[in-house]
Structure formats: C-alpha cells, structure tokens
Amino acid sequence: MKNLFLFCRAGYEKECAAEIQQRAAELNVGGFVKTNNNDAYVVYQCFEDDGADTLVKQLPLDSLIFARQMFAASELLADLPESDRVSPIVAALSEVSKAGELRVETPDTNEAKELSAFCRKFTVPLRQHLKKSGSLLAQENPKRPIIHVCFIGPGRAYAGYSLSNNSSPNFMGIPRLKMAADAPSRSSLKLDEAFAQFVPKEEQEERVRSGMNAVDLGACPGGWTYQLVRRGMFVSAVDNGPMNEKLMETGQVKHFREDGFRFEPQRKNIYWLVCDMVEKPARVAELIEAWAINGWFKEAIFNLKLPMKSRYKEVMAILNTMQDILKENGITEFKLQCKHLYHDRDEVTVHLWLKPSQPWN
C-alpha cells in the first residue's frame, strides 16, 4: 500500500505532517502529505507502491510525537454506494491476509463522530465478509495485523492495516480513562495517560510502585500529585499555592510552599519527578536538565507548553538540546520520549528515564 494514514488532534495536522515528512525521509521513503486544517488526520502518500508497508514496519509509532495511531491505507474509497459499501472495502483489503481484529473508526472531530453509530452497525456485516474473503480470521488474535476502516465522511473511507506490535491498542488511538470523582483537577488524567503511554504494563509494578518517593513541581491544586498518591507514593508537592485538603489528609504528601524553579530536594532518594507548570517550554526543559545533571531523580514526566507557531520545530529543538546537554554532562545512557497525549491540549508530554539498564539505588 502507498498511503500512510495518521490520526492526530484536530488543529495539529501541520505538526503531524511535518513530522511524518521528516521521519519518512530518514527511512528513504519519499512521498508527500495530504491534509486539511481541523480534519484530525494526515495522509502521507508514498511514491513507491509499498512505501506505507515499509513505514508501518520500520517507523515505531511510539517515536512519533503528534500521531495517535497509523495504518497503511488504500486510496480513498470515495462515493461508496449505499446499496453495497462492503464490496469495495473488501476488494481494497485483498492484500491483507488473516488479520486478527477489525476497527471501523472515524477521525476525532465532532463532524466525523456523527458517523460513529453507523460505524458500529456497519462493523457486523463488514466483519462477516472479511472473514469469508480470508482477510480476517474467524477468531480475534492480538498477535495478527489489525484491519482499519476509517470513514472521513458519509460514503468516504480509507481501508488498510496496522501491525499489532506497532500500533495503539486503543480505538482511534484514544485511551478511555475515567476522571476520578475525588481528583483535584482534570489535569490528573494527563499523568494517568502518561504512565500508560511511557511505562509498559508489564513494567509498571517495578517502575510505578507503592512506597516510592516523588516530587511534583508546580503541584497546586494536586492533579498530578493525586496520581502519585493513588499509586502509593510519598510526594513532595512544591507550589506557593494551596493543595487539595483531601490529598494532604492522606499523610503521603508534604507541601513545600516555594517556587518550583528554586526547590532542591532535601533527600536524594527521588524516583519520580513530575512537572506541569505553565511556563516557557525552554525554561522547564532547563529545570529538568539541571535535576538530571544533579542526579536527583530516576524517571521524569513533564509537560512543555507549545507556542502558537512552529510547534514541531520548537519541540524538536528543545528535545535535541536536552540530549546534547545530558551527553555533555556525562549522562550517556538515557531514554527520551515525547507524545502529544489525548488529554494534552496545546502542550506535549515528555518522559526522561536516566540509566534504564541500571537498577534504582
């Protein structure tokens, strides 16, 4: 297949497009981008007929900042007849054999989501016909490719596949997280999603566990502290503002009424550092770099607020500078990841893991 379909947040098509253009070029997969503002998706059309097949194999989804999900796709199936939408889609998927799951999706826009009821109903007959054609297995199999059919409008869809080991497990790439009734703020969901995004489920028991010490810079009123407390951690919450009373009553939180940029931990036994401050992204990055150079944490999750223009360029400049500074200061082993999470708005979330091969303390 020659098209790569990428889901993203509405309004971030330009950033997603710039990123896939650069990353595909690094893999020598030439092509061009087709996108419109606020469509919540980008199509990268490769020059080679198998270009998208190469990208879904060689380009890790987790390494992309602005794409929530991606799949190798057919040409746009336009004007699907109401009398038989199934046959053209089955024909477009003839290259796909023995897939393990079917997802009939839409982009994440209000207009496209009006098709969601139709998509649910349409999944049943489409699934039956794909099983008959051999494109879909009779039983779901999480280790086989996933078939995606994305309706971008009535009677208009892209059809294709993703690989199960390089794909979001979530429908449309969107995690379904519930806002806890006692969480101090909606920002709490950002850290909840970040843990799921950056720490594999099988490693969470070791890396996100009860009894750990954590620091939350810019903690007020406690949305991110809440997620740390919920996981049994002891938290130094740093903010001049007031903290949520229920959080303080847990006995797991010590509130330091001071500026997060000036705070220095009294004890150097911090595993997690988290930070969601409304501040210039370069200044936040410099703060995290200083903590890393001092060895004051093992893993950090922090948000970078995005400028109105040149957002992809700005993020990449900050991440590249951070890598250079860490290396210049003797920190050669680290893992740096960045994602525009579903619960992020005009910001991205970054994860920095220092010396992943070495155990903590």
UniProtKB/Swiss-Prot annotation:
<feature type="binding site">
    <location>
        <position position="259"/>
    </location>
    <ligand>
        <name>S-adenosyl-L-methionine</name>
    </ligand>
</feature>
<dbReference type="GO" id="GO:0070677">
    <property type="term" value="F:rRNA (cytosine-2'-O-)-methyltransferase activity"/>
</dbReference>
<dbReference type="GO" id="GO:0005737">
    <property type="term" value="C:cytoplasm"/>
</dbReference>
<dbReference type="InterPro" id="IPR011224">
    <property type="entry name" value="rRNA_MeTrfase_M"/>
</dbReference>
<protein>
    <recommendedName>
        <fullName>Ribosomal RNA large subunit methyltransferase M</fullName>
        <ecNumber>2.1.1.186</ecNumber>
    </recommendedName>
</protein>
<comment type="function">
    <text>Catalyzes the 2'-O-methylation at nucleotide C2498 in 23S rRNA.</text>
</comment>
<dbReference type="InterPro" id="IPR040739">
    <property type="entry name" value="RlmM_FDX"/>
</dbReference>
<keyword id="KW-0963">Cytoplasm</keyword>
<keyword id="KW-0808">Transferase</keyword>
<feature type="binding site">
    <location>
        <position position="187"/>
    </location>
    <ligand>
        <name>S-adenosyl-L-methionine</name>
    </ligand>
</feature>
<dbReference type="InterPro" id="IPR002877">
    <property type="entry name" value="RNA_MeTrfase_FtsJ_dom"/>
</dbReference>
<feature type="binding site">
    <location>
        <position position="239"/>
    </location>
    <ligand>
        <name>S-adenosyl-L-methionine</name>
    </ligand>
</feature>
<dbReference type="InterPro" id="IPR029063">
    <property type="entry name" value="SAM-dependent_MTases_sf"/>
</dbReference>
<keyword id="KW-0489">Methyltransferase</keyword>
<keyword id="KW-0698">rRNA processing</keyword>
<keyword id="KW-0949">S-adenosyl-L-methionine</keyword>
<dbReference type="InterPro" id="IPR048646">
    <property type="entry name" value="RlmM_THUMP-like"/>
</dbReference>
<comment type="similarity">
    <text>Belongs to the class I-like SAM-binding methyltransferase superfamily. RNA methyltransferase RlmE family. RlmM subfamily.</text>
</comment>
<comment type="subunit">
    <text>Monomer.</text>
</comment>
<feature type="active site" description="Proton acceptor">
    <location>
        <position position="305"/>
    </location>
</feature>
<feature type="binding site">
    <location>
        <position position="276"/>
    </location>
    <ligand>
        <name>S-adenosyl-L-methionine</name>
    </ligand>
</feature>
<feature type="binding site">
    <location>
        <begin position="220"/>
        <end position="223"/>
    </location>
    <ligand>
        <name>S-adenosyl-L-methionine</name>
    </ligand>
</feature>
<dbReference type="Pfam" id="PF01728">
    <property type="entry name" value="FtsJ"/>
</dbReference>
<dbReference type="GO" id="GO:0006364">
    <property type="term" value="P:rRNA processing"/>
</dbReference>
<dbReference type="Pfam" id="PF18125">
    <property type="entry name" value="RlmM_FDX"/>
</dbReference>
<dbReference type="Pfam" id="PF21239">
    <property type="entry name" value="RLMM_N"/>
</dbReference>
